[in-house]
């Protein structure tokens, strides 16, 4: 579950239980090291060894989960969880607002030039198109381009979209596969589709994504 959320950029706050601190390293029943286990699937993972740490660590974990759209894990040993503590003042938490990312003008102009010369353009939409359904349909209308969606883009672009031709990928349809196979310009919007054999062999591929990696 947490690995899926990490991969799909879903903000999650997870509190993972741990054995009593006095038993760590002594081959205790079902002993693991949660702070190591969860590092691979989180952007924040900290161990609470004193109850006084909890308010500030909780504050930072929530900021990390929402700000990074990722998983934040707090590891809480059983003995620490039952300790009493006095709280003088709680951190003031305001929900962070995600930044609005704007592409470079030069990149937009270069993309527009490719779209002007493309004869068979296909739009390939993923989860990054959330909230942009109308814009995707309008772009498809202007380009007269079919819209193919990835599995996670289905709920954002398929409905009420006369240009949608279905999904591609391991669970996709022939129509979606053919629309990509036969295009000369593929515009990937909000997807990092990993299945290389489904990409066109001789087309220009333009990727619009918030993550440049």
Language model segments and positions:
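N-terminal alpha/beta PP-like core and its mobile active-site loop of ThDP/TPP-dependent enzymes
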Residues: 1-213
């Amino acid at each position: 579950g947490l690995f899926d959320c990490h991969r799909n950029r879903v903000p999650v706050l997870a509190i993972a239980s741990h054995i009593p601190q006095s038993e760590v390293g002594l081959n205790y029943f079902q002993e693991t090291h949660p702070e190591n286990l969860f590092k691979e699937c989180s952007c924040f993972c900290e161990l609470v060894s004193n109850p006084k740490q909890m308010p500030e660590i909780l504050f930072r974990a929530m900021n990390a989960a929402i700000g990074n759209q990722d998983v934040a894990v707090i590891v809480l040993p059983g003995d620490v969880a039952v300790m009493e503590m006095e709280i003088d003042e709680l951190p003031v938490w305001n929900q962070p607002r995600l930044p609005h990312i704007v592409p470079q003008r030069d990149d937009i102009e270069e993309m527009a030039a490719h779209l002007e010369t493309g004869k068979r353009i296909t739009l390939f939409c993923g989860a990054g198109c959330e909230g942009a359904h109308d814009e995707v349909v309008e772009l498809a209308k202007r380009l007269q381009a079919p819209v193919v969606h990835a599995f996670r883009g289905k709920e954002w672009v398929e409905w009420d979209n006369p240009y949608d031709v279905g999904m591609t990928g391991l669970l996709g349809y022939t129509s979606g596969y053919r629309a990509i196979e036969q295009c000369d310009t593929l515009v990937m919007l909000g997807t990092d589709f990993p299945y290389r054999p489904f990409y066109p062999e001789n087309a220009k591929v333009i990727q619009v994504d918030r993550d440049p990696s």
